[in-house]
């Protein structure tokens, strides 16, 4: 937290917030040089030792290692794993199977702290900081909006599980179907079309109810517009928010993509499967994940299963019955986005970044 705050303060001192195109840390690197910028950030961070915003001072391991990257060969990766279902086990065993990664080369152990929708409270953040101090380990943020605790031993895992339970971060969810990633969407983004976080929550609910939340080997990502902040284009199941028109009314909708993946020295963008009303998107996920879980063979990836199941277009034909809008009188909920109370309107504001500048 101290490093993050130091970066923000350094940018506030030396960065340019008046010009959107240059309101980026990369421009400080370009004009100041990475070595000079790093030195100023570290200087700012040391100043925070006495700051009330970071109780307890800076952990010794942070001072010792600074901002050095993890280094090749030590990063945790779940690519290429065998999809599994882990129902019917005790809580610790389920957590171990889903959220613990063991390094084959160097014998290291890493454990994930699960953050539903990437949300974390102040108490949880400070709890993670205390775990870092107590065990002298690295804690890093992942691109799936969770935290990974690195440098653990096998003997420490039961204790770590109990500590994470205290902060409600022990749920087995990492790399499982329930680990849905979403951009902020219309909650806070001026150029978002739909409430992508609301859809992510609805998908999680639907998967839980269908008993499919702990199906492994499938990643679900959502963006609230055509931009790729939610990385929907490189996920097994991706959604991008769009405006739909039905019965003379605007309604929230999504374009569903299938088959995107990144890993094993290759990348593939998801292909269009079908368009859906926002309120039918969760059911489409339940159908696809359920079909994948029941039909896959041992070790088969989602993309391999999709390839032998007719591809995105083939699977999309099985979902066409969901692309139906009832009239506003029959079901007005179809014309109101998640977490909203009034009729849907695709209002696009001024971008806060350089995306549309």
Report residues per predicted region.
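Peripheral terminal and linker regions in Fe-S/redox and tRNA-modifying enzymes
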Residues: 1-357
């Amino acid at each position: 937290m101290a490093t993050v705050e130091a970066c923000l303060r350094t940018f506030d001192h030396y960065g340019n917030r008046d010009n959107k195109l240059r309101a980026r840390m990369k421009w400080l690197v370009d004009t100041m040089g990475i070595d000079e910028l790093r030195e100023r950030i570290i200087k700012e961070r040391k100043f925070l030792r006495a700051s009330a915003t970071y109780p307890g001072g800076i952990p010794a391991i942070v001072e010792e290692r600074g901002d050095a990257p993890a280094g090749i060969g030590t990063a945790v990766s779940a690519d290429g794993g065998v999809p599994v279902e882990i129902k019917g086990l005790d809580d610790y065993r389920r957590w171990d199977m889903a959220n613990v990664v063991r390094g084959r080369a160097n014998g290291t152990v890493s454990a994930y702290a699960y953050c539903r929708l990437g949300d974390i409270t102040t108490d949880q953040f400070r709890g993670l900081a205390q775990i870092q101090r107590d065990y002298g380990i690295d804690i890093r943020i992942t691109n799936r909006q969770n935290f990974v605790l690195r440098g653990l031993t096998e003997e420490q895992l039961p204790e770590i599980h109990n500590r994470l339970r205290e902060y409600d971060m022990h749920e087995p969810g990492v790399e499982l179907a329930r680990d849905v990633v979403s951009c902020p969407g219309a909650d806070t983004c001026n150029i978002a079309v739909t409430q992508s976080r609301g859809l992510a929550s609805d998908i999680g609910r639907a998967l839980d109810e269908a008993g499919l939340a702990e199906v492994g080997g499938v990643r679900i990502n959502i963006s609230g517009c055509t931009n790729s902040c939610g990385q929907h284009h490189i996920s097994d199941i991706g959604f991008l928010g769009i405006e739909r028109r039905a019965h003379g009314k605007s309604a929230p909708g999504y374009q569903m993509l299938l088959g995107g993946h990144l890993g094993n020295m290759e990348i593939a963008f998801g292909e269009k499967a079908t368009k859906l009303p926002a309120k039918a998107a969760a059911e489409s996920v339940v159908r696809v994940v359920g079909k994948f879980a029941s039909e896959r063979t041992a070790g088969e990836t989602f993309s391999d299963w999709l390839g032998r199941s007719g591809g995105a277009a083939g699977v999309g034909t099985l979902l066409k019955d969901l692309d139906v809008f009832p009239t506003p009188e029959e079901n007005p909920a179809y014309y109101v986005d998640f977490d909203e109370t009034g009729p849907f309107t695709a209002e696009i504001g001024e971008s806060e970044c350089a995306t549309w500048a």
